[in-house]
Amino acid sequence: MATLILGSQWGDEGKGKLTDILCPKAQICARAAGGHNAGHSIVANGVEYDFHLLPSGLVNPNCMNLIGSSVVFHVPSFFSELSKLEEKGLTDVHNRILVSDRCHVNFDLHAAVDGLEEVELGDRKIGTTGRGIGPSYSTKMARSGVRIHEIFNEEIFERKLRQLAAGYKKRFGDLLKYDVEEEIARFKEYRVKLARYTVDAIQYMKEAQDRGYKILIEGANALMLDIDYGTYPYVTSSNTGLGGIITGLAINPTKIDNIIGVVKAYTTRVGGGPFKTEDLEEAGTKLQEIGREWGVSTGRKRRCGWLDLVVLKYSTAINNYTALNLTKLDILDTFETIKVAVAYKDPQTGEEVEYFPADLDILDSLEVVYKELPGWNKPITDCKTYYDLPKEARAYIEFIEEFVGVPICYIGTGPKREDMIVRKTSAIKE
């Protein structure tokens, strides 16, 4: 059986915390797509761990971890992240991580190109993390990329990397500050070190499913950053939703038991792109400060605003959530009134639009229709059960459930691992 944890907004919803809570029951924890642009922190046994490329199931000493075939794999970050986890006391991490031999390699070359492409775009820049994720997927789709298994054939590896570098050099000239021979030299060491981690992930996952293993899959980024369904072109370069999980891990869709959408009690976004409920006044600043809204991967401050239920309903239609995890509800503790977007409106006709349009110009022209709900004006972090919560907080939760049509089974009430209320467990298949 498999449980999926997927971001329902623009990322940074708090997926890692739920992964940490659920992974003690999992035998395998896997990532399907994305790269080391993703980032989240987990606090376990009083220690904070940062994850970017690695699955956060590594905090569970009894869990195997897999990086799936649709991930773009930055080799230096892989080893660096493993070392940092060891330094913080996690043991045996090298024996509990595997990497699909079908992953495409994310080179330092790709990061250099990423920065130049952002400069080319000027005012239309995407606001990428600068980690080379987009260029890595571009070379993958152009069929000029290098896969993990090709690292072990030195002749093929060096020829393909030199060809890739030559193509970019032709495009960018002296603006490209990159030495292909230096990167080739580094991979002579990586070639030896990587062998123990590389696996045929298709066979590995098939055997795990056939044996009935409990598999926990953590999505990277979120649905609104999906290359097909997000606010294109202000998106990442992979499929971040349900479809990307099935493709990236070759998982049997009939063996997926739970699809848990993680949704922050308000909304944040990093980088450029549409954000209809963004608040540039006092409320947005307050959310940013209380919520400590700056990125694990980049340190950039996140844009903040109210919860957008149009976005959540759209996300639900694509990912088919069976349950929701509402996170960071405690950040709203001191708000007298809480606004929630329930529709968009055409200012010319007054007609309400309840869907999320593909055309960003149309989206930009629409006004937001808000519903105002009363705040609870008291701390909730010490609440351990649903009915410990103030009635206003429960009303907020139930309004979201009714609007979206999906039960909220997990409620985050603080930063610690134990600050999570579990309810409606009948909606979750064990």
Swiss-Prot record:
It catalyses: IMP + L-aspartate + GTP = N(6)-(1,2-dicarboxyethyl)-AMP + GDP + phosphate + 2 H(+). Its cofactor is Mg(2+). It comes from the Eukaryota. GTP binds at residues 11-17, 39-41, 302, 328-330, 412-414. IMP binds at D12, E13, G14, K15, N37, A38, G39, H40, T129, R143, N221, T236, R300. One of its GO terms (molecular function) is adenylosuccinate synthase activity. Substrate binds at V296, S297, T298, G299, R300, K301, R302. Homodimer. NCBIfam families: PRK01117.1, purA. This is Adenylosuccinate synthetase.
